Amino acid sequence: MTSLPLGVKVEDSAFGKPAGGGSGQAPSAAAATAAAMGADEEGAKPKVSPSLLPFSVEALMADHRKPGAKESSLAASESAQAAGGLAQPLGVPPGSLGVPDAPSSPRPLGHFSVGGLLKLPEDALVKAESPEKPERTPWMQSPRFSPPPARRLSPPACTLRKHKTNRKPRTPFTTAQLLALERKFRQKQYLSIAERAEFSSSLSLTETQVKIWFQNRRAKAKRLQEAELEKLKMAAKPMLPPAAFGLSFPLGGPAAVAAAAGASLYGASGPFQRAALPVAPVGLYTAHVGYSMYHLT
């Protein structure tokens, strides 16, 4: 309570009195006291270090690192790997830290990894060491992602025509027998029962063999005859060129009828005048060019 009035009095005494004469020491003492109080306040405030901020432009451009930062990061990584291998510095390969990798121990599955999303066991993500085992995971072998294997069906058994058990083997004809049969066929295509029996005995053949040979030979002759007739028809057909115009009439059509009517009316006017022959004018509507040129040549 007593300090505040004293301070006011000091200020009144310091600024109320005019400077000069014997009272000049009072203002200097007050200034010294104020400077001492300001120095104590500055010492009590925390000093701001002039070092650069870590994310400022100057810090990024300078890229100064403390000498103990690398050692601390190495120690932290070693301790993390010794604890369980969960933590690893970002951007640093695992072999560069001097710690050998453990290939046999699989890494635990994370929440956002492939195995974690698909809920697969850890053994499914480990690569097969032996080359004989196919590198296919269970989700690839499921029918949802891969088609089912094709069933190998056994080939159907080839069913052959069953012959009769009492069927006689086919006896090939000799050259002499074939010549005799061909000569007899040219003479007569149909044999009677007596002629067939006599002819078969002369060739040392059965009547059935001679009968079947004549039947086959008649069928062959019929096929050859039909082929020859087809060739003759193709040769006799005239090779006409396609029509030059769409509209055409036969030669001497409506024009010939009109000419004949005019000749009957005006042709025989005199006793010594010849009868006029109907001449069809050559034009667009008489006949197509190909047909007329073919018959003119």
From Swiss-Prot:
Residues 1-50, 63-109, 127-157 are annotated as: Disordered. Residues 127-136 have a biased composition (Basic and acidic residues). Residues 25-38, 71-100 have a biased composition (Low complexity). Its main location: nucleus. InterPro entries: HD, HD_metazoa, Homeobox_CS, Homeodomain-like_sf, Msh_Homeobox_Regulators. Residues 166-225 bind DNA. One of its GO terms (cellular component) is nuclear periphery. One of its GO terms (molecular function) is DNA-binding transcription factor activity, RNA polymerase II-specific. Keywords: Developmental protein, DNA-binding, Homeobox, Isopeptide bond, Nucleus, Repressor, Transcription, Transcription regulation, Ubl conjugation. Acts as a transcriptional repressor. Capable of transcription autoinactivation. Binds to the consensus sequence 5'-C/GTAAT-3' in downstream activin regulatory elements (DARE) in the gene promoter, thereby repressing the transcription of CGA/alpha-GSU and GNRHR. Represses transcription of myoblast differentiation factors. Binds to core enhancer regions in target gene promoters of myoblast differentiation factors with binding specificity facilitated by interaction with PIAS1. This is Homeobox protein MSX-1. The gene is MSX1.
